[in-house]
Amino acid sequence: MPSSYSFDVVSEFDQQELVNAIDQLRREVDQRYDLKDSKTKIDIKEDELSIVSLSDMTIESVKDILLQKATKRNLSLKIFDFQKIETIGGNMVMQIVKLKKGLSQEISKKLSKLVRDNMKKVTASIQGDSLRITGKNKDDLQAAINLIKKQEEELDIALQFQNYR
C-alpha cells in the first residue's frame, strides 16, 4: 500500500473534439438557408478561433451553433472566451474566441490557498500549468476534490482531475 496518494488538477480540453465541433459548425453554416450567403469563415489556430462574417447577427448565430456543437461533443463551455466583435474592412465583422487551456498562476495560487486553509491533511503544490494535491488518505483527497469542485463555478474555468496515484 502506498504511503501517500495524489492527483493533479488541470484545465484542458480535447483538441480533436474541438476540431470536430468546428467541422460540424462549418458544415451547418454552409447548409443553413439563413447563413448560406453570409460569407462566414471560421478559422482555428492553436489557442484561438476567429469568426468572420457580414453582420453581428450572423456572428451571434454562429456563436450559438458553436456552443451547441461543443456541448454535444462534451466540451466545457468555459473554455471559450469571446472577445468583442470588431469591424474589419469590406463591410465584414470579426470576433476572436480565445481558448482557455491550463491553470494560470493566479488560479493555481487561489486553489492552493483554498486547499491549505480548509484541509490540514493534504498538501498542494503548483507544477507549471497544473496543481498537484497529495495526502496520506484517499478520503482526504476526495474531500479536496469536492472542495475544488464547489469553487469551480466561481473561478469560471473548466477543471479536470487526472493522474490519480
UniProtKB/Swiss-Prot annotation:
- Single GO MF descriptor: nucleotide binding
Q: Does the keyword 4Fe-4S apply?
A: no
Q: Which InterPro entries match?
A: DUF520, UPF0234-like_C, UPF0234_N, YajQ-like_sf
Record keywords: Magnesium included?
Answer: no
Query: Cellular component GO terms, alphabetically?
Result: cytosol
Q: According to the UniProt record, which cysteines are disulfide-bonded?
A: none
Leader sequence segment: none
Question: Keywords of this protein's UniProt record, alphabetized?
Answer: Nucleotide-binding
Describe the function of this protein: Nucleotide-binding protein.
Q: Which family does it belong to?
A: Belongs to the YajQ family.
What is the protein name given in its UniProt record? Nucleotide-binding protein NATL1_05371
Organism (species) = Prochlorococcus marinus (strain NATL1A)
